């Protein structure tokens, strides 16, 4: 295998780059450039002068490997020079400043010095070589004019577009060797002459056009290039093999088999491209090459890529799949009968399988067959298709006989030896008593093929002397199976009967067959079979899914248990019912009857319109539909078979009437009838629903590469139906507004799909059966489990085109939910496709006491409760959603019926048991001002099942949210509230109703939070920026390492980004310089931006001004979530945008909640006056003096740092409230006792102590519990951990004495090592205190204090009072040192990277110390007034410069947090 791969290296793998500079006289390159297009050669390197001498310059290799003399020169500083003259190549080299980058390749058999040779080779369109040929031609046409023998067309100028010459002149040029290319196109000769060594003085300088090609019109070049590209070359040839390389110049595979296939074609030179062949697969690319030269662009989110061998393939970023098929060619695909011999239709693939031989895969319809589709189509065309289905059936029936003497044709006798793989042929027929059994396929290298006497279409007359005319399919199968391996069987065959046409079966040309395992069909793309094998028997798998036992109905393979092979129902020994054939005609609204499951098959449950189904009676069991046995098909499959018939079609039904139906014999009867026909074909890949009994394990005999793997996949896909669930079939007709429901989920292969909101007055609501939170199992019979959100939307789009859809949903039945006996307000639709009334409804135990609570809120308030959701899978019988907090004074509190610990099982009557946290948020948001909660009291909750399927909100099919969710992770000890085993950490989403109107695009906020990968196609726009003196003027957040996308974090003032006007904070970056950003790291994003040089091309999706926090997706994120539906006041008019997502890591007790709510309103009037509009454009001078926002959001007590205790809000210190700015605002200096807020701490589980990002984004920087720094003190001491900026800025000097850099580093290192502990809150020092500095003794105490708080679990609940001053001093030292450490400013344009995935490419101008002091003094009086109003008896400070001693307050150490991976509890200074 490795040798094969090694042989397929493309010449591209030999390309090397180096940077060189010259030392010598100006203009002397120190290297010799030879060749040139005027000589018919590539530019190539001559001698490199590496030693001075002879007065010439020398060539010095700066980086990379030095090229060798003779190497072909491809590019100079990224500019292609192939096709240029020697003069122009030298001019390009001299144009660039040293050092210059050279891209060279060693000459080989594909690329060498001969330019004419390379242009004569034939390459696959779109390949690297084909593109290089186009580049060569473009360069040639800058200085030469192609010639042609055709007459000028309108608008063409001789000597400009073409040189129009006679045929004699053309041949003379060709014989003289003056043409680099020559050929014919549309009956005319075309040629490309060698260019002159010197350009014409009347032409533009070709070098300028090469270097600045964007400024020149290339339309005329393209016209000529197209003509030359399509012409049939006179000296056309395939490229010779490189040493140890196949002909990768064509497509990188060079299979001998495929090379021969194209050698005969001469109609178009492009046809001779061989097909792709790898690991016994071949994909025909000639159809690909036949397309027009100028194809339309690829569909959205598609990308063309190349393999290592240069072969192109296509990437669908919507579905995360790759394909060799060009999606643009599906509209131009030829019909199979129009394809040439050896050519496959578009979408077909040939498989050479060692086990099954050669067969063909139709990727478009997802089916397989043994017969070549082209040969099949041509055969059908020859015999004609004009006869109707019924006429053909009548003719075939007329020919049937049980008397061998009456057979027409030639009798052939064969003796076959059974091998371990069977007899090597497949059979069809025997599904009716009057149908022949015929050979369908003779498998390659099988016993039948080796014998050479059997042929497709042969009728099996007798087996070992036993006449089998009139025998059923299963009878014959069993006879073959009874033959031991290595034993012979004597067959008598009759040759002279054609195989029945596939179109006789109504489903042939529409769908693929789907193998069935355990009575259930496999997923789309996992198993396929040919529609030609419609009547084949089935492969039997053992219980382990092994495929060693193949029924003789398909492969006539080894023996299997006889009890698995049954005869038809008529011969199984059961009572013989009456078989009746009833002709039906499909009416405009269907067949006029409804069907339902029964133990013996699909039963007619109701006659809806007798005029279309005369003779049909209620209770009839459907055995065959249009001669297709449907006994083994499930309800959905039978429904789909009926649906596919057009209106007015005559459809005969074979029904079973009068037979007993014994439920006790259900399993046996199903098994008995399973093998009467191997017909497992379904419509549009329908998927049966789980049956209430395990049928025999059968599957199609269609070849599959790994049956065991397919079985395991299908077993996972169709595992037994969970308990306490029921499945419903809902048939909906499309209205003008659609089907009337939303779709949730599909975020990954293990994510389920759910029904979202039901649209009022829509089709789903009118039908009445569909509910939000129902799990979607199938769409029109196609299973959706494991499919992506985009694929589900595609299925719904297809259904919308059809005008109707059949949905199979699974509904969780949890205790306390009222379930009607029959979910069918509309008993049956009139489409002939009624839904199934299933009998296997789960039995219900004694229900728990549940009750509905209706909450109504005002427009300016929330509902006031917190939902906790366990993200780890709860134990059986546990509802994962519960009330975690009820906010005092809120609607939830006023109601009086919600208590902490109560479980929520439904919202507005819709089960939320299996919904994710985000989807519950959306449901409640959609509820408006009134919501109904179904509550199970905590003490009574013991039984409802739970689910942890995380469903993602559909970005395209989502209600417009009424407000924005705001995420705040609040680790804390929740065991007391939750009463649930497990480690639950809370992530709260505050539902802001009033903030909604301040957001420009509320919908996209939800999309960005959810991280929908399918939203990339929504409203993206490109922006190209040129680098300014300090970069591009924006900073990034996110990356793969932070489990989030890339977002615009900040825009620099006067930077290129903000000047452009189209980029805004919060916009998501979809592509950087053409490369998608999905899944790339932050570092890679920076590299992509740098790689663009002075320009960067961004593809952006508009945001709302909020930046998702990587903490929301952090791998250390808590394992449970809570939602706060609470009031949030509107932001200040000066704020950039409403903050929608915030993050904190502090628990809050009920006591603190009350205090916050009671004192926030009084505080708001004072604080809002002092708040200053924050900037999101990266204006560093303003940011330097911005204080960190208050810790606790208004009416959001969950954001205050520190464990809840009675003294939490002593004085005014606890009444920190969240500002309404999108980024931190300036704050006035406060009393020293006031600065007791906590430094944000990294998660405890993070070994490196990475803290969660505290950015300046609208959703960040608020309520983080960060240190409040007075205006003149410079930057936040914890800025690095908070990730406020990636670009360090120069700080103001803090006093006359400062700590050394060593001390600063030590202090910062200590704070970083405290990965999971709460750094004790550093107080804001008065200016005098700051000037005094910090002694080394204090520094040591600082480290001691940090070590003592490193492990919250080990901390004592009591603290030694003597250690408090030391700890406080250590925090002061930490803050001052951090400020000094951050005082160093990098060079212009330097980019710094913090731990939170942010980088800044611009730095801003620092403010002077005097300006900072002036600003601080301007706030002095306001600080004084505010300090007087503070509660708690704190000493006053009338001036920010006044020295005030630091009085250590009582310290409260939180109890150990039991939650794994949670940040330690923050301490609070009072």
Curated annotation (Swiss-Prot):
Name under which the protein is recorded: Membrane-associated guanylate kinase, WW and PDZ domain-containing protein 3
Where does the record place the Guanylate kinase-like domain?
Answer: 116-290
Q: Which InterPro entries match?
A: GK/Ca_channel_bsu, Guanylate_kin-like_dom, Guanylate_kinase_CS, P-loop_NTPase, PDZ, PDZ_sf, WW_dom, WW_dom_sf
Location in or out of the cell: Cell membrane; Cell junction, Tight junction; Nucleus
Q: Where is the WW domain?
A: 296-329, 342-375
Classification via Pfam families:
Guanylate_kin, PDZ, WW
The record's region (Interaction with ADRB1 and TGFA) falls at 18-108
A single cellular component GO annotation: cytoplasm
Sequence segments annotated as region (Interaction with ADGRB1): 729-811
According to the UniProt entry, its GO molecular function terms are: ATP binding; frizzled binding; protein phosphatase binding
Q: From which source organism is this entry?
A: Rattus norvegicus
Could you describe the subunit structure of this protein?
A: Interacts with ADRB1, ADGRB1, LPAR2/EDG4, FZD4, FZD7, GRIN2B, TGFA and VANGL2. Interacts with PTEN. Interacts with ADRB1, PTPRB and unidentified tyrosine phosphorylated proteins. Interacts with DLL1. Interacts with PRRG4 (via cytoplasmic domain).
